[in-house]
Amino acid sequence: MYEVRFHGRGGQGAVTAASMLAAALLEEGKYAVSIPSFGFERRGAPVVSFLRFSDREIRQLTNIYTPDCLICVDPTLAKSVDIFSGLKPGGTLVQATNKPLEQVIIADTVGVVGLCDAIAIALEVFKRPITNTLMLGAFAKTTGMVSLDALRRSLEDSDFRDAG
């Protein structure tokens, strides 16, 4: 089983991103479950969401405390929240940022890093700083665990196509 924890701020689509990635993984024949975390979050407040996927049925529907991968859709979040808490040694970080690797906050447990200037791309393409779908593409490129075609199909054939 592979576990992903999404970090973002309210309104950035971290919860939606987990659902979109689950749909793409299902499209490729995997078992996947996204687990939103709701509380008293408001727009701009830190939020988390979770995703598990496997070749076998998934029965565990709890929060993820020791993820294999972190997807952070907000480039400033690591300054105020310990996004690396519990990351497995050698884990993967997929981070939205316009900074070079040397200037990005990266914990010692991180083994693989994927960076994406998602805000600039989103502003150019969508005219809004909606980075969640771009970060899924960065996840696909960084890990190779889902194809861009599956991501595209899951977005085109679902309710997510109207989300931004």
Protein language model regions, located:
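Active-site cofactor/cluster-binding pocket
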Residues: 1-164
